[in-house]
């Protein structure tokens, strides 16, 4: 028996955004049947978001455990209409913005659906309010126009982009969470699910929501602060060890900061007026980091970790992707699964996270070939129309 919590959901992806793709992938990992509708002849633009040497690996990362269909809504036969399809899927994921629904070849049929699906619309900020929005409406600028990028980097340097699709993943995760909440409510109340509409910057605002009231009270924005959390006087740096390994050091509380200062400079450093209090450390952080970096650079990673553990200091190695693949704890937790890339080399992919007790892991399947499941999808919809 299939006990995956979303195995009863049929999801139709109509967009080409990373945020929508992530939302679909999250639900696919819990058993949902996710069908990506791809345009012929080239397929979804997401396939080509990276250089050609990495496209197979990339597509298998973002579209594993999904199905591909290639349906032109204008060429459907009379036996099956767009309304039939929309009425017999549970969720639609798109990225066009609500103002475009009435002219979209798929969603213009939404009002005539006998049974309305839940529509998740995650669109680039400004798409629906171009008269108010400054700059580009491309999704790539979400980190910039949400305030997140302004907080990343050194205090005396330019903003720095985070080289991970944080904005897209946040939007996808929040949309998927909201969708499941709305589906649960609509099924309990026997009503049609209400559409979920979200401009991408709205997801990232949740990450900086505490800084907005502070800015409104002080009349100026919170500034980026290097490796320190903005407005934080804790010690937080990433020094280099003697054997060329970077580590992360964190001493946020006064108690831990004192232990760290005693460790690297003894009572003289810990009691020095420049470092003895949070305010003093905040005013002299650059000098303190020079002392910390010098101490760390005189020892190997193994030595630093051992000494820090003995002194009850928060220190850990900074892993790269290869380190994670060989980390015993990751292996023991079964966080990764092997996948053969359609006759190419084997690779590893993350499995469903979080894990739910008593539910088996979904087998990791290759991302679909273009249009490989069109007939299966049409047969599925046809069967649903007969029931």
Model-inferred region functions:
Residues 182-224:
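Substrate-binding/catalytic subdomain of NAD(P)-dependent oxidoreductase enzymes
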Residues 165-180, 200-208, 252, 256:
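Mid-domain beta-loop-alpha active-site segment that forms a flexible
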Residues 1-9, 240-242, 322-387:
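Terminal low-complexity tails and localization/encapsulation signals of metabolic enzymes
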Residues 34-37, 309-323, 384-386:
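Short, well-structured beta-strand/strand-turn elements
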Residues 230, 235-311, 315:
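Aromatic-enriched alpha-helical interface/lid elements that frame and gate functional surfaces
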Residues 218, 222-236:
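Active-site Gly/Thr loop motif
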Residues 41, 124-126, 200-205, 243, ...:
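Glycine-rich beta-alpha junction loops
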Residues 1-189, 339, 369, 373-387:
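N-terminal helix-loop segment corresponding to the beta1-alpha1 unit
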